[in-house]
């Protein structure tokens, strides 16, 4: 227990030391060119408005969710035979979510 506490304290001290060294050695030039947006080498004129497509955000979110569910499937499939019930329940849940996304029209690739 003492060794674990020593490792924890050493890790926290090392983490704080690296953070402090990084803070002290970093360049703190907050000029206009440093904090402004880069537009092909020209100085930006006016307010820059970032357009963000919610459609692609939803597609990315669905990809991440289904990707994580596939990883969970792999964990279930390598275990014993009694876990197939939970596998089927999770699979039905995923198919239900996929059907709901299809029903609401969120799987359309054309904007």
Curated annotation (Swiss-Prot):
It is a multi-pass membrane protein. Keywords: Electron transport, Membrane, Mitochondrion, NAD, Respiratory chain, Translocase, Transmembrane, Transmembrane helix, Transport, Ubiquinone. It is found in: Mitochondrion membrane. Its EC number is 7.1.1.2. It catalyses: a ubiquinone + NADH + 5 H(+)(in) = a ubiquinol + NAD(+) + 4 H(+)(out). One of its GO terms (cellular component) is mitochondrial membrane. Its main location: mitochondrion. It comes from the Eukaryota. The keyword Metal-binding does not apply. The keyword Cell cycle does not apply. The chain crosses the membrane at residues 1-21, 56-76, 85-105. GO terms for biological process: mitochondrial electron transport, NADH to ubiquinone. GO terms for molecular function: NADH dehydrogenase (ubiquinone) activity. Belongs to the complex I subunit 3 family. Core subunit of the mitochondrial membrane respiratory chain NADH dehydrogenase (Complex I) that is believed to belong to the minimal assembly required for catalysis. Complex I functions in the transfer of electrons from NADH to the respiratory chain. The immediate electron acceptor for the enzyme is believed to be ubiquinone. PANTHER family: NADH-UBIQUINONE OXIDOREDUCTASE CHAIN 3. This is NADH-ubiquinone oxidoreductase chain 3. It comes from Caenorhabditis elegans. The lineage of its organism: Eukaryota, Metazoa, Ecdysozoa, Nematoda, Chromadorea.
């Amino acid at each position: 227990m003492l060794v674990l506490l020593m490792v924890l304290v050493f890790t926290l001290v090392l983490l704080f030391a690296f953070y402090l060294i990084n803070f002290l050695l970093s360049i703190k030039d907050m000029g206009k060119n440093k904090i402004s947006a880069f537009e092909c080498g020209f100085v930006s004129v006016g307010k820059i408005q970032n357009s963000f497509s919610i459609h692609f955000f939803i597609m990315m979110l669905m990809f991440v969710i289904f990707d994580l569910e596939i990883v969970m499937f792999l964990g279930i499939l390598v275990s014993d035979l009694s876990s197939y019930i939970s596998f089927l329940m999770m699979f039905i849940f995923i198919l239900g979510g996929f059907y709901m996304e299809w029903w609401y029209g969120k799987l359309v690739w054309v904007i």
